[in-house]
């Protein structure tokens, strides 16, 4: 079991305005009226939403005004469990992109794009976005992209990424993306499994004040993807005239690619009408036990779940301007872009959030009138360490919500936000995962914010904390489970014909119940949730989710190292860092030079954010009798717990090497 956190004092940090007529209030009243229920508060609404989950999703479909060409025949077969992966909204026909582009005010800004170190902010109206998507889609069709084909982006958080994704979705192609900070191995581990027909990328990116050439990496990636028919290169940092793409097979500049979609007149926007369960996105697991699993998310499930979170939980409307600091390799990018469906404006920022100054995001908030800011918990902690006080340097008048995810938000960060950023803001810690491309729990405009707690479990998400016996526990740590079907679970994994990988990933711990791989604790008094870190071998420092095997693949190339072990360590706030242990090969010594070379290799092949916090020497690495490296046991030991059952180990004495390591104290 995870270490118990201190008892929460349930200190209120923010309270909702009782006079405010929110979407959540209006939805609760609508449900009470149409279903003949008495729903006095959020808790009543939540309990109904999980007990009568089919009715809940039907009511929300109606409330959210989803655009469809055919209504559903059945919401879901309620006799099926979450492990059966039931089909949702059978018979309906819709298109995800159509729902994001439906906003009628043509001149309203849909996208703002800001880049590190650039004063200029690009703006795209909803009408311009529709025209661009039509052009991208026409060019895709011209080259033979059809329903079910994979279109991928190796792209920064930019307007081009949104346009290409929406065009792919409009056709019924499946979109997948990684960000330019991924190295060659990281990209090929993902994209090679899904055999894309078309890739979009850039020639260079700027991060942390430096320009990083991208073409060599792109060339290596393209060579590893034999099914590619076309490589579209977008001049992003330099002008086209200075870029040489002649070495990249089947490559074309964006301008020339789009020209193929132009006829005598501008192409019309066409939206393929597809089943609710039609694949929209392929997302990736961390790759803990080998190649990353490819999670297929449906168009309808992603849309309705994101709309629920944006409209009901976030009270979002067309008056909002949202910026989430993310890359295209994180699910928060997909989540952010769906906000267009509410008519809100989306701000895309590409670059470091600390360059040219740590105020860069606050400057954007004041300049654009941003109302919702999303970030990683780590960024808030960094600002606090730097003693930044945005409330003294910035207006922040428009800002009503700050969202945080990626890792647990420390209690002291709540204090920092309310004291030094804005006292009236809703600070929403949100938590879910790539596996559901959304949240199990998060912000809520109708209930208080308590220090150190995520506000509530989200509507329709039957979340509990279970002990090892499979019993719900309250006020103590347990495995985060979801007990009822949800439309946002993956429809399947790519290349998992019989579904065995899918079942193993979520349903091997508790039969018929989704086990998410997180430990959490639900406060029985407030209903708030405290996240306590991962319960499996996945590494997730600062929201960058990856597997130990991705690190091992790099370290194996060093002849000085005979073996390695990569594990997370958590502090009392649930913050995570990654520790890499090296077992040296005979006649080789552990050295700072080796540590530097390994760090550099990981940075180049994967990204700077994959580099372990500490690299230490060990004399032995534990294995099971059947030859599996045992990370979980070491993770427990460095957290101060005993490993009682040692019978499965071929070398149990090695476990003692991880007791009381000086470098791991006082984290």
UniProtKB/Swiss-Prot annotation:
Its EC number is 6.2.1.16. It catalyses: acetoacetate + ATP + CoA = acetoacetyl-CoA + AMP + diphosphate. It comes from the Eukaryota. One of its GO terms (molecular function) is acetoacetate-CoA ligase activity. GO terms for biological process: fatty acid metabolic process; positive regulation of insulin secretion. Coiled coil: none annotated. It is an enzyme of class 6 (ligase). SUPFAM superfamilies: Acetyl-CoA synthetase-like. The keyword Disulfide bond does not apply. Keywords: ATP-binding, Cytoplasm, Fatty acid metabolism, Ligase, Lipid metabolism, Nucleotide-binding. It is found in: Cytoplasm, Cytosol. GO terms for cellular component: cytosol. Belongs to the ATP-dependent AMP-binding enzyme family. Converts acetoacetate to acetoacetyl-CoA in the cytosol. Ketone body-utilizing enzyme, responsible for the synthesis of cholesterol and fatty acids. This is Acetoacetyl-CoA synthetase. It comes from Gallus gallus (Chicken). The lineage of its organism: Eukaryota, Metazoa, Chordata, Craniata, Vertebrata. The gene is AACS.
């Amino acid at each position: 079991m995870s270490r118990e956190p201190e008892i929460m004092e349930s200190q209120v940090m923010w309270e909702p305005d009782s006079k405010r007529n929110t979407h959540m209030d209006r939805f609760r009243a609508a449900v009470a009226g149409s279903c003949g229920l008495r729903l006095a508060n959020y808790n009543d609404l939540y309990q109904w939403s999980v007990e009568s989950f089919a009715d809940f999703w039907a009511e929300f479909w109606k409330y959210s005004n989803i655009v469809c060409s055919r209504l559903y025949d059945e919401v879901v077969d309620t006799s099926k469990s979450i492990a059966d992966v039931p089909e949702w909204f059978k018979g309906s026909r819709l298109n995800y992109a159509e729902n994001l582009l439906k906003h009628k005010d043509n001149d309203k800004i849909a996208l703002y794009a800001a880049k590190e170190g650039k004063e200029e902010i690009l703006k795209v109206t909803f009408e311009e976005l529709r025209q661009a998507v039509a052009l991208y889609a026409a060019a895709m069709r011209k080259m033979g992209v059809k329903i079910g084909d994979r279109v991928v982006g190796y792209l920064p958080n930019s307007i081009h990424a949104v346009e290409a994704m929406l065009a792919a979705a409009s056709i019924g192609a499946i979109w997948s993306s990684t960000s330019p900070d991924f190295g060659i191995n990281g990209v090929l581990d993902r994209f090679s499994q899904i055999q894309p027909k078309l890739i979009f990328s850039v020639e260079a990116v700027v991060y942390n004040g430096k320009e990083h050439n991208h073409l060599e990496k792109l060339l290596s990636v393209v060579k590893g993807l034999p099914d590619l028919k076309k490589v579209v290169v977008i001049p992003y940092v330099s002008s086209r005239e200075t870029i040489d793409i002649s070495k990249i097979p089947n490559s074309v500049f964006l301008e020339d690619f789009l020209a193929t979609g132009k006829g005598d007149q501008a192409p019309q926007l066409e939206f393929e009408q597809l089943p609710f369960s039609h694949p929209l996105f392929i997302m990736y697991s961390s790759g803990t036990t080998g190649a990353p699993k490819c999670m297929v998310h449906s168009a309808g499930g992603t849309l309705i779940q994101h709309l629920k979170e944006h409209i009901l939980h976030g009270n979002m409307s067309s008056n909002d301007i949202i910026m989430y600091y993310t890359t295209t390799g994180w699910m928060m990018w997909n989540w952010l872009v769906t906000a267009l469906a509410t008519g809100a404006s989306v701000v895309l920022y590409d670059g470091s959030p600390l360059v040219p100054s740590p105020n860069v995001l606050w400057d954007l908030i004041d300049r654009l009138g941003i109302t919702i800011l999303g970030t990683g918990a780590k960024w808030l902690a960094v600002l606090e360490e730097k003693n930044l006080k945005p409330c003294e340097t910035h207006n922040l008048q428009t800002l009503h919500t700050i969202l945080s995810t990626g890792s647990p938000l420390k209690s002291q960060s709540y204090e920092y936000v309310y004291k030094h950023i804005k006292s009236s803001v809703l600070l929403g810690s949100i938590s879910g995962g790539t596996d559901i491309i959304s949240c199990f729990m998060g912000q809520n405009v109708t209930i208080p914010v308590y220090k150190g707690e995520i506000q509530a479990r989200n509507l329709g998400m039957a979340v509990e904390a279970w002990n090892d016996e499979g019993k719900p526990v309250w006020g103590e740590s347990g495995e985060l489970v979801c007990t009822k079907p949800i439309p946002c679970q993956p429809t399947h994994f790519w290349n998992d014909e019989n579904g065995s990988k899918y079942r193993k990933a979520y349903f091997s711990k508790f039969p018929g119940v989704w086990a998410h791989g997180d430990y959490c604790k639900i406060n029985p008094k407030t209903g708030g949730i405290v996240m306590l870190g991962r319960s499996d071998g996945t590494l997730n420092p600062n929201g960058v989710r990856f597997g130990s095997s991705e690190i091992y693949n790099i370290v194996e190339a060093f002849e000085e190292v005979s073996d390695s072990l990569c594990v997370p360590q958590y502090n009392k706030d649930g913050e995570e860092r990654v520790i890499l242990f090296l077992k040296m090969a005979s006649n080789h010594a552990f050295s700072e030079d080796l540590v530097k070379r390994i760090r550099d290799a990981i940075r180049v092949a994967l990204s700077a954010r994959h580099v372990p916090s500490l690299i230490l020497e060990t004399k032995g690495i534990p294995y099971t009798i059947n030859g599996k490296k045992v990370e979980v046991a070491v993770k427990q030991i460095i957290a101060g717990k005993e490993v009682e059952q040692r019978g499965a180990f071929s070398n149990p004495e090695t476990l003692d090497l991880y007791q009381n390591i000086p470098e791991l104290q006082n984290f």
